[in-house]
Regions:
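Glycine- and aromatic-enriched membrane alpha-helices
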Residues: 1-415
Length: 415
């Protein structure tokens, strides 16, 4: 558990520095050929501009969110050192460049051929289903594939073996905190406190989360004979992710439909990946990746023409169900580009790290626990484990790792 907390601390700390030095300029700087920003490194030139500071801080929190998505998916097996490098790269390069294409005046939103196709506007993403969540989800997929499953996650026949989470109570508490926080995430993306659409966005956000959670609950109840708490929690987050792109442009009834579909996606997406050997500890890929994609497509389907593009003041955003086939095509293009960019760059990053520094701890360290092996602490120091309470082999492995770490260093480098 300490390892997960430490990764999240570094996602925000290292991510803040990386986004300050490089990421913000690539994302929001003056565009070069609508591909990447070229000005504003280290916030040079705008250090005392209130608007620049506010934009940097607002976008930073979104950036850190994308980084933390990967943390949950690849838990319990990556080296801490290489994880810190990953965190810096996603915040400095991967998230900002795709973000520039949609939010920084880049080609997906503003190129002539995209605006002509969409009927006056290119691809859109109100608050980050694609820019934040799908990017994080598909980088997580790349990380899971490169790392492989945890020891004991599958038997010799390849059948998945459940590994229970640390605390369902904390998971539910976290879901409620996220649910509440999303009312800053989505309504806050209006960038204006007097924007009247805030009320619609808040209602849509809540309805979609509720519909997705209820759907996930009924699916697991039907499948297992009992309503599954963890999958219902993932349903809440899946609904929040799915509504993040279309929240300003769809009607409340559409938000409910989007949430119902999100509930199906998170359940069956997780089981599909699990059967194929993808060990996604937190369900981040179906929650954020697949439902981030669904959010982009849902915008292209359900946008009802009652609200414009807040950035360009385009009056009416309409989707496929309201006769705008071209805008749905723009969203499809955005989905394909999103997956290709996030998964491609994520796979390349983890591949390079794997074949240089290494990305996975040793089997002994993994079994002993990364709290002890890489951070030198245990989560609950007052707990006393006896032989009957823990497998003997794991106790021996833990002791051997601790002894090895306490041996005098004789020079050389650990692989």
């Amino acid at each position: 558990m300490n390892r997960t907390l430490m990764k999240n601390l570094m996602d925000y700390s290292v991510g803040s520095l990386a986004f300050f030095a490089v990421g913000f300029a690539l994302m929001m700087g003056t565009s070069a050929y609508m591909l990447v920003g070229t000005e504003g490194f280290f916030l040079a030139g705008g250090a005392y501009d209130v608007g620049t500071m506010l934009t940097w801080f607002f976008m930073l929190v979104f950036c850190a969110t994308a980084a933390t998505i990967v943390s949950g998916a690849i838990a319990e097996r990556p080296k801490f050192s290489t994880y810190v490098i990953y965190s810096a790269v996603i915040c400095a390069v991967i998230y900002p460049i795709y973000g520039h294409w949609l939010w920084g005046g880049g080609w997906l939103s503003s190129a002539d051929f995209m605006t002509a196709l969409g009927g006056g506007y290119g691809a859109l993403d109100f608050a980050g289903s694609g820019v934040v969540h799908a990017v994080g989800g598909y980088v997580a997929l790349a990380g899971c594939l490169m790392l492989g499953p945890r020891i004991g996650r599958y038997n010799s026949q390849g059948k998945p073996i459940p590994i229970p989470g640390h605390s369902i109570s904390l998971a539910v508490l976290g879901a409620f905190i996220l649910w509440f926080g999303w009312f800053g995430f989505n309504p806050g993306s209006t960038l204006s406190a007097h924007e009247l659409r805030i009320s619609v966005i808040a209602v849509n956000t809540n309805l979609c989360a509720a519909a997705a959670a209820t759907t996930a609950m009924f699916i697991t109840w039907r499948k297992f004979g009992k309503a599954d708490v963890v999958m219902t929690v993932n349903g809440v987050i899946a609904g929040l992710v799915a509504i993040t792109a279309p929240c300003a442009w769809v009607a409340p009834w559409a938000a409910v439909v989007i949430g119902i579909v999100a509930g199906f996606i998170v359940c069956y997406g997780y089981w599909f990946l699990e059967r194929r050997g993808v060990d996604d500890v937190a369900g981040a890929i179906p929650v954020h990746g697949l439902n981030g994609t669904w959010g982009l497509l849902a915008l292209g389907l359900f946008a009802d023409g009652t609200y414009g593009n807040y950035a360009t003041e385009t009056p009416f955003i309409t989707g496929l169900l309201y006769g705008n086939t071209g805008f749905f095509a723009c969203q499809l293009i955005s989905v394909v580009v999103n997956f290709a960019w996030a998964f491609g760059t994520g796979f390349l990053l983890f591949y390079v790290l794997k074949h240089t520094l290494g990305i996975r701890v040793s089997p002994e360290e993994e079994l002993a626990g990364l709290d002890i092996c890489e951070h030198g602490v245990v989560t609950y120091p007052d707990f006393v484990y006896t032989e009957p309470a823990r497998p003997t082999r794991i106790i021996r492995l833990s002791e051997s790792v601790i002894e090895r770490e306490n041996e005098p260093k004789t020079g050389g480098k650990r692989g």
